[in-house]
């Protein structure tokens, strides 16, 4: 087939058929253009078939004749394709995206993203700040900060709003898109310039592009912060305000069904396809496990799925995402705070174990030599309280509606095994952070080593959201009322 005749399918069935095609001939007058951005799915209804009257439209003369490597012939009826953008194609006469975001800019609202070391502050329509707070001796607070960009004053005035409306009315502005989790998503860019000078770029000011994307249930959260080139950043913000503009709404592409009817002398489905699907079923259907294997499968539900990530500019050590079983939140919180439920993470040679209020271990398991364990840090309440007098154990943030909440707590675990390099005991700061997620029982664990044998362990989970506000002045947590 020619390149323009290729179809993208939802699944492997169509690919198998097309790979076995020798030739195709077209029925009707004109074959519609096919796009790789639109998904298709093959169906095999047989010779007696009535086209659907609802949904995606079809025409009797809109078909191609497909011939497989086994000389089987099929008449494949093609849809008049839908791409999910029908509403977007209509004329829109509402406010421009800039005007829709104007209330957010005028509110003097700020959003925050807390990572293991850095905190990112986006004050919409004003500036982006990256900072780290640390208490020094004598309770003096030390702040390391960089401005990643500032908004020019004219950009958020009524003049700027009128300019956006003028562009919308006279010549609609190009809609930019970004690949977010595998989906091309429309966004509205806001440029921030004149940030803190960058020593790596001859003291040129830092700059950022803030990408606002539609999310109906969001509260202007920061989805991600990335340094795309040296001292140039991209910040993705979720906001419900853009959802009022049809061209910025997220849409999933509908699957377009292609109905292939067998022609005289051909089976209902291609023989090669039937054979392949049979092989796939054999692979997917293992022997029924015995009782011991079933128990092992249950234990594996508590296992950790590991994957590497990059966190800020710090040296990456490990990361793990644990999917906790469906225990009740109350039971899970009690087990977590008692230290009886521990989190595991890590990739490569070393793995990590964190038990709240007990210890942080680094270990390696070998079938021949057994388990090797290094104590990274051990909990001692008095040592943590002394540490908390000089460091920030409980950090706050103000939500867009003006409510002050705890954003993160930090705990000190010292007295670990002696480090061969520094000849000092290992120690680790454990940072617990609320993380909103569609999966209420998902936990992300990552470890950094900003200095030799001095670690930062990050633990983020929706479960932690329920207990952060119980933190006392030392950052210690308790079971909520």
From Swiss-Prot:
Query: What keyword terms does UniProt attach to this protein?
Result: Disulfide bond, Endoplasmic reticulum, Repeat, Signal
Is Endoplasmic reticulum there in the keyword field? yes
The phenotype of cells or organisms lacking this gene is: Embryos display head and axial defects during organogenesis.
Q: Where is the signal peptide?
A: 1-27
Function according to Swiss-Prot or TrEMBL: Probable lectin that binds selectively to improperly folded lumenal proteins. May function in endoplasmic reticulum quality control and endoplasmic reticulum-associated degradation (ERAD) of both non-glycosylated proteins and glycoproteins.
Q: Which domain of life is it from?
A: Eukaryota
Asked if the keyword DNA-binding belongs to this entry, the reply reads no
Compartments it resides in: Endoplasmic reticulum lumen
Q: What is this protein called?
A: Endoplasmic reticulum lectin 1
Q: Which GO terms describe its cellular component?
A: endoplasmic reticulum lumen
Q: List all disulphide bridges recorded for this chain.
A: 110-123, 198-231, 214-243, 342-355, 419-453, 434-465
Q: Which BP terms does GO give this entry?
A: endoplasmic reticulum unfolded protein response; ERAD pathway
* MRH domain: residues covered: 108-245, 340-467
> For this UniProt entry, what is the primary localization, expressed as one broad class?
endoplasmic reticulum
Matching entries from Pfam families are given as: PRKCSH
């Amino acid at each position: 087939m020619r390149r323009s005749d290729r179809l993208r399918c939802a699944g492997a069935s169509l690919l198998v058929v097309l790979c076995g095609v020798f030739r195709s001939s077209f029925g009707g007058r004109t074959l519609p253009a096919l796009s790789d951005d639109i998904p298709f799915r093959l169906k095999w209804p047989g010779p007696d078939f009535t086209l659907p009257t609802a949904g995606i439209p079809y025409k009797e003369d809109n078909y191609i004749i497909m011939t497989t490597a086994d000389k089987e012939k099929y008449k494949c009826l093609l849809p008049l394709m839908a791409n999910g953008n029908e509403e977007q194609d209509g004329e829109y006469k509402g406010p421009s995206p800039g005007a829709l975001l104007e209330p957010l800019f005028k509110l003097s609202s700020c959003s925050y993203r807390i990572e293991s070391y850095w905190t990112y502050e986006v004050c919409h329509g004003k500036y982006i700040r990256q900072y780290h707070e640390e208490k020094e001796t004598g309770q003096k607070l030390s702040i390391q900060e960089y401005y990643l960009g500032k908004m020019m004053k004219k950009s958020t005035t009524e003049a700027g709003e009128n300019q956006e409306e003028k562009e919308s009315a006279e010549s609609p502005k190009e809609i930019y898109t970004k690949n977010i989790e595998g989906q091309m998503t429309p966004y509205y860019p806001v440029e921030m310039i004149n940030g803190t000078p960058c020593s790596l770029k001859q003291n040129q000011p830092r700059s950022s592009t803030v990408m606002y994307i539609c999310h109906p249930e969001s509260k202007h959260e920061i989805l991600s912060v990335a340094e795309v080139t040296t001292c140039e950043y991209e910040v993705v913000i979720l906001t419900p305000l853009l959802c009022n503009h049809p061209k910025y709404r997220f849409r999933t592409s509908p699957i377009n069904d292609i109905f292939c009817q067998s022609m005289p002398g051909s089976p209902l489905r291609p023989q090669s396809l039937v054979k392949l699907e049979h092989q796939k079923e054999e692979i997917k259907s293992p022997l029924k496990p015995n009782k011991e294997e079933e128990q092992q499968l249950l234990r594996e539900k508590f296992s950790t799925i590991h994957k590497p990530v990059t966190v800020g500019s710090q040296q990456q050590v490990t990361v793990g995402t644990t999917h906790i079983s469906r225990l009740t939140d109350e039971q899970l919180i009690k087990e977590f705070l008692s230290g009886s439920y521990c989190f595991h993470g890590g990739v490569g040679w070393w793995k990590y174990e964190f038990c709240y209020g007990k210890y942080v271990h680094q270990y390696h398991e070998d079938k021949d030599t057994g388990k090797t364990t290094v104590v990274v840090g051990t909990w001692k309440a008095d040592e943590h309280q002394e540490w908390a007098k000089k460091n920030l154990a409980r950090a706050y943030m103000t939500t867009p509606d003006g409510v002050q909440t705890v954003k993160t707590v930090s705990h000190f675990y010292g007295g670990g095994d002696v480090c061969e390099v520094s000849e000092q005991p290992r120690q680790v700061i454990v940072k617990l952070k609320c993380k909103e997620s569609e999966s209420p029982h998902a936990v992300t664990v990552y470890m950094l080593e900003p200095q030799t044998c001095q670690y930062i362990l990050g633990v983020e989970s929706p479960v932690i959201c329920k207990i952060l506000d119980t933190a006392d002045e030392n950052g210690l947590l308790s079971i909520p009322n």
